[in-house]
């Protein structure tokens, strides 16, 4: 398949074992709307399409026997208007039933509103904003894997409790970055720390030197990177180059790191980073078996938590359609909340009324080159953050689906 088709068109994969009588148009269609060419493409992108295909294959062998399922994919170019336009086209012209991945918080919020108004299931494994399960929650929107609170609760809480009390943030200037900075700031303050300042940078920035120098000049004990993907990689590389945040009086903390980021940085540069992750391929036998299948289809790359989340969300959606014997979004959304989430990716997982999927998270640390035993052996799990502690509780939620 040509890259232009993957990037701007719709990649269709139809896997069928005959039609399913209860499906409205005879086929269940899932769209993977992701970043195929920008700063988040390594953590999602083509790998998210691969993960969705694996979910289809697995469900057809089990709960989905006899169903016809089609996967579509497109590049949203990290633009909310393009994402909304493609999602609307899928819903109106292609009769897509569900959309997954949706990396980029601005993209996710635009599609959440559209799907809420027009119907259809939205499954978010790539964006981080907590607005998806608060003021912008939807009865047919589900937030998988992580959010800004889970990342702050893991990284910021761990470092603050170790005595790293004063923080300065380098923040990407859009909804995701603002949310990540706010949640991390709240966690720091709740644990007795202070925030001395912040500076914001554009998405996909190439030069972080001025932002990092400002952060260094703050004399804060921790420079917190409230960004993700290629921005995180670039910021860490440039910080190491200028020896910023590498001394005993000031350290660098990345609040959202993916396995693909560690791979891009290399262990020599990334070693010692501590962060929260929702999936690690070498965690147990199930995750290792899943990763082995995935890498064979994804040019040897192990899955990130975004890609693992696409697999889990698409599989759970499909088996919910099968159990409901319907692709009606209201019926399927209810069934998704009823059924347990059991797959090779998630541990101790369930869906709350606000659409937040809660599950165990892991506090991990990047290994040194000497500790690594081979390709992609990058992380060691320091501790498990239980599902009921990893995510913000609903008692302060701004979601109108939550009864108080």
Predicted regions and their residues:
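Extracellular/periplasmic Venus flytrap/periplasmic-binding protein
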Residues: 85, 130-131, 138-242, 279-289
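Short, low-complexity disordered leader/linker segments with a strong preference
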Residues: 1-29, 398-404
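Beta-alpha junction/loop-to-helix N-cap segments that form part of ligand/metal-binding clefts
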Residues: 23, 27, 42, 46-48, ...
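Venus flytrap/periplasmic-binding-protein-like
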Residues: 76, 130, 203-204, 245-266, ...
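Solvent-exposed, acidic/polar segments of extracytosolic/periplasmic ligand-binding ectodomains
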Residues: 28, 340, 344-404
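Extracytoplasmic "Venus flytrap"
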Residues: 24-53, 74-81, 103-104, 170-178, ...
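Periplasmic-binding protein-like
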Residues: 90, 94-103, 123-125, 168-171, ...
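Extracellular/periplasmic periplasmic-binding protein-like sensory domains
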Residues: 236-312, 321-327, 370, 377-403
